[in-house]
Structures are given as C-alpha cells and as structure tokens.
Amino acid sequence: MATTYLTLTNSVLRELNETELTSSTFSSSRGIQTAVKDFINKGIHDIYNETGEIPLLYARTTQDLTVGDNEYSFPTDFRKADMDSFVLKPRELVTNGEFASNITSWTTGDGSPSYTSSGNGRLNLNDAAAYQAINTTVNKTYKIQVRVLSPNSSTTGLIIRVGTSAGGTQNLNTTQAVTNFREGAILNTTFTASAQTSYIYLEAPSVQLDVDYVRISRSDIATRKLTYVTYDSFLQNNKPTDDTNNSSNYSVPLRVYILPDHSAFGISPRPNTNEFTVSYDYYTTHTDLSAHGDNMSLPDRFRTLIVDRAKYYTYMLRSDPQHAQLADRDFQRKLRLLKVDYATKNDYMRSDVIGESIATNIGGRVS
C-alpha cells in the first residue's frame, strides 16, 4: 500500500519529537507541522530532479498531424521527451476501437450491443449490430483489421460492412467466420473510400459474437522512426525549404526537432496529409501532495528517502547543521540505491552511418 502524505509527515514529526497530526487536524497544521509538510514536497522535488528519467514518471502520447503545420505543443505535464522515441504512423481512424473499458462512440444498429470485460475489453453483439462514422479521403485505400471471437462456439460469422451510410456496402461487404474458438479469427483486408465520411458496420445475426478490436488506417502510410536533428541543424538545412510558401514541399515527415524553449517539437518536412500520427515517450512532472490521503508515487521502500530529506530541511530551519549533515548523508546513500534501481541504463555505442534504424553494437556496454 502506498505511503500517504499524513504518514510521511508524521514520520518526520515523530523523529523530531513534535506533535503528530491526524486526518482531521492535517489541514489546520501550524508552525513546525506546516513546515514539515512543505519539506516533504520539497524532498520529493529533489528526488525527481536528481534522477530525471525515472520510470515512475514515464508516459506515452500521440499527436495527430495537420497538413502544412510543423510545430506541435508538448502535453501540459511535460518534463522531458525521449527524442529517439518519435515514430510516424498512419492515424487510427476508429474511436474506441479497442473497447478497453466501454463501447462509447459506437451507435446501435440493431438489437442491444453491450460491453464485456473479457480479455482486454470487447464489444458483445448478441443478435445485434453496431456502427461508427469515420473521416476518410475519397479514392484512398484503407487497411481494416477486426478480431472476432465466438464465446458460444458458433461458426456463424461476423458481418463487416463499410459504406456511405450505416449498413451500406459501397466499399466493403464481407463475413468473418470463427473456427478457432479460443483464439478467434482476424479479418485483414482493405477498402477504397468513396466519400469523406465512411461507416464501419458490425453485425452478429442470430448469434453471440465478441469483437476484440477494430482498426482502420491508411494503407499507403508506412510506420517509420523519425530521425532526431538539433534545432540548429534544422535551421541550417531544412527550415528554408519548409518555410517556402509552396505546398509541393509538403511530404512525408522524416525528421523531428525540439524548440529551444522545450515547449514544442517540430517535424520536417511539413506533412502533406491529415492522416499522420506521431507517437513518442516523455517524462512527466509530478504533482505535489496536498490532502492527507494523497499517496506518494515512489514505492514504499523509498519512504525513508523522503523522510531523510525533509529532516534535513527541518534541521537547517532549526540551525542545526550537525544533524542536517547526518540526514543529508542518509539521503544521499539511499538516493544512490534508487538510481541503481531506476536510473541505470545499458548503453551501447551505435552507428547511424548505414541507416537511421540500424543500431550496431560496436564495443559492448559503455561504462
């Protein structure tokens, strides 16, 4: 169980022989109690500032690209981006196609579609149908992938249609049968859009079937890693072309850079379609503890690390440098243990001479 703000505060107060707080008196703390509460958060700040890329602050996000736009803001909780993690891929057009926790964004076409928590979450169709409208580009070809399972071991197939209206068959009309009842079956096919709005329609007639996921994206967009370049390199080599007022310079993005103020990232060349998505990893800023029941993000075994840092600041407040030095020594020792657990990486030398995505292990681990 994660350690609460109240527990951390009382751990420090107890070692200082001060009056402890309760859940009812926590918000009305006074004097040294309030100072210790502040020092708890200050100590947590120190830990995260010392470790930087701590996995507990790791996050992954995506950014949909817009034709002609080359700079995009980082999330509000952004701290630091892994610039080697930027990947360009086709935009996923289906909303909530994984059915992770519900079937919102899907409209009932017939019967009573429902959500089931089986697997990672599924759309349950028991003599029912559901559909969703998606944005498409006329005359462009799209990949569609649907995984279907039969909980009652029925071989009756799932009807899958794509058209210009709900249930329309202008672009696709097929059936995916299930014979392997444990693994289910996966439909992999394509369709060419004939309208700006297309409808994906799923129907299980007179049978119960579960849909694990529905995925649709452009077939002519390949997933590729974006090459990181410095902002200076972008200014010298790419910006003049990218800023030319000519849409013929728009193309498939190849490079990514970060702005000097670290508020946004840029891609080059400017995208030539709205159907690109960029995914990347970043590290978040942490949120200060506030209420007595707030939990620290670090594992419980590092509780004393925060306590030692708060004690250090408290002793400094009391003009007690000797005890402050002892508390700091304990903090530094435990901080090294945390870095061993979370901040140590197996780094290897790489050569990017042959290709952007080829990493060559030249000399083993770099110590």
Describe every region a protein language model picked out.
Residues Y131, K143-R147, I159, N188, ...:
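Beta-strand secondary-structure signal
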Residues G111-A129:
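Short carbohydrate-recognition loop motifs
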Residues F99, D127-T155, A185-T190, V214:
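Extra-cytoplasmic beta-strand recognition segments
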Residues G167-Q196:
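Extracellular carbohydrate recognition and processing domains
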Residues S153-T164:
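Beta-strand acidic-aromatic groove motif in beta-rich domains, primarily in extracellular
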Residues L125, T137-N139, N180-R182, A193-A195, ...:
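Surface-exposed coil/turn segments at beta-strand junctions on protein surfaces, enriched
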Residues M1-G97, T104-T107, Q176-R182, E203-Q208, ...:
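Glycine-enriched, solvent-exposed interface loops adjoining structured elements
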Residues L158, I186-R215:
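Extracellular beta-strand ligand-recognition surfaces/modules
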